[in-house]
Amino acid sequence: DIALMSRELITKYPQIEDYSTIWMENITHTTAKGSSEFGLSNTNKLIRQYEYATGLKTGSTSGAKFCLSATARKDGVNMIAVVMAEPDSKTRIKDAIAMLNYGFGKCSIYQDEKALEKIVYAEVKHGMQEKAKGETLEGFRYVDTSGSDLSAVEKEVQIQKQTAPVKKGDQIGEVIYRLNEKT
């Protein structure tokens, strides 16, 4: 549940990282009696101890012990590690780092920002124009956890013949990616 909530937070509100990565901050508190400055430090020591750390939340009570929902980013891959009921703060950081390193060690990312390297056209039957220009709406990302050689990814562009009317936003084909004979 903690991992799911953390994923929702960092996905829907990525600006949380602007706050969760702050190590120390001086705050000025102003009242009618004047102002005073005091320092706040992040209780998530992972921020200082792990170069890929991006947050997120620590917690501890006598019942729950020491807990952490840790987020990190390395080579375009985001990870979440949740540790609970640790005996102390140092152990929670050590175990979170071990989990994150394990995850990053298992994951490789294949990314194709421009799925189409050239402009493609689909034939159009009964149209005012014989061809419709095609473009991709977004790039392609694949996270591999099997240790496959991602340089072996094959890409195939398939364009289907269209019948008029063809309007902007209509799908005229697809880009298919294969790795080890799997799509």
Q: Language-model segments: which ranges?
A:
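Domain-terminus/edge residues, biased toward the C-terminal soluble/receptor-binding domains
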Residues: 4-183
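Active-site loop and adjoining helix of the penicillin-binding protein/serine DD-peptidase-beta-lactamase fold
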Residues: 1
